[in-house]
Each structure stands twice: as C-alpha cells, then as structure tokens.
Amino acid sequence: MKIRKLMSTVYGMLMSSFLALVLVPTHVFSDETCMSPYMAKIVGQEDYVYVWTLGQVGTGDEQDKLVTIAVNPASPHYGNVIGHTSVGGRNEAHHSGFTDDRHYLWAATLDTGKIFIFDVHTNPAKPKLHKVITDFTKASGGIVGPHTTYALPG
C-alpha cells in the first residue's frame, strides 16, 4: 500500500512538472503597452520616466511631487533623479497617465480629489505643473478620489 501511495505521489509530481513546462511559456514577448489605443506608438529609447510620488511627513518638503528620472543609457545622468515638481501639499498621490499625444501627464489623487496636469512635452527633463483641477468631486456629482486617468481620443 505504501509503494502504491509513493508511486501515486511521484506520478503526480512528474505530471505537475510536465504540465508546468508545457503550459508556462519560457519566453515572453510584448509590444509597447499604452494607456490608450489611440496613443502614438513609442519608437526608440525613452529619455525619462516620470514617477508620481506621495509626500511623507519628515521627508523632504513633505509634498506630493512628480519626480523625473533619466532612463536613456546614453545619458550621463542615466538612472539618476534629475528633477522634481512639488504640488504643494499631501493629496495621496495615486495613478497617472499620459494624454494620447503624450504632451501632458494627468496625475490623480485619492484624499483631496485633485487632478494635477503636468506639461511633459515643452521641456521633458523639467515638467511644469500646467493646471490643477480642484473641483472634480463637485463637478462629477460626488465622486471622491479618482483612481486612474485615461486618455480618450479628441
């Protein structure tokens, strides 16, 4: 009986391993992932990545901010923070997304319901705060804490 149970266990383990090898791809290929199907395809190396960050008490200026990092390996600043744009306060920074032309980055917040719009096109290394939507909760009929922004055509 013990041998039969052992054989059953070994068989189960072998079948699990076989199925894992057959069903799980060993190479994964992907194309550019975009926020919107209407967004222009990114061609070539990105120069910067924008990180929408939370302000924290006792750290820096304690404000939410958009941080710019150089990501082009050819840049002498590769892998370094090259700038940041504070938004004046802590709003529980959350998700962000590009407009379909990638000229603006919309950054949502949870606590205040504000939406910050950054111009990342005029000078990509030094984004500027373009506009702040402060009445989203009222204008949307009471929706609080927009989670994700999404670019639609037009």
Model-derived features with residue positions:
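Beta-strand-rich domains and repeat architectures in extracellular enzymes and scaffolds
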Residues: 31-71, 78-110
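Loop/turn residues immediately N-terminal
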Residues: 112-114
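Bacterial N-terminal signal peptides
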Residues: 9-27
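Asp-box/WD-like beta-propeller blade repeats and closely related beta-sheet repeat scaffolds
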Residues: 120-154
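N-terminal secretory signal peptides that target proteins for export/translocation
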Residues: 1-11
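Intrinsically disordered, low-complexity Ser/Thr- and Pro-rich stretches
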Residues: 3-4, 24, 93, 109
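Short loop/turn segments immediately following beta-strands, especially the blade-tip
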Residues: 69-77, 117-127
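Short glycine/serine/proline-enriched coil/turn segments at secondary-structure junctions
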Residues: 57-60, 76, 124, 141
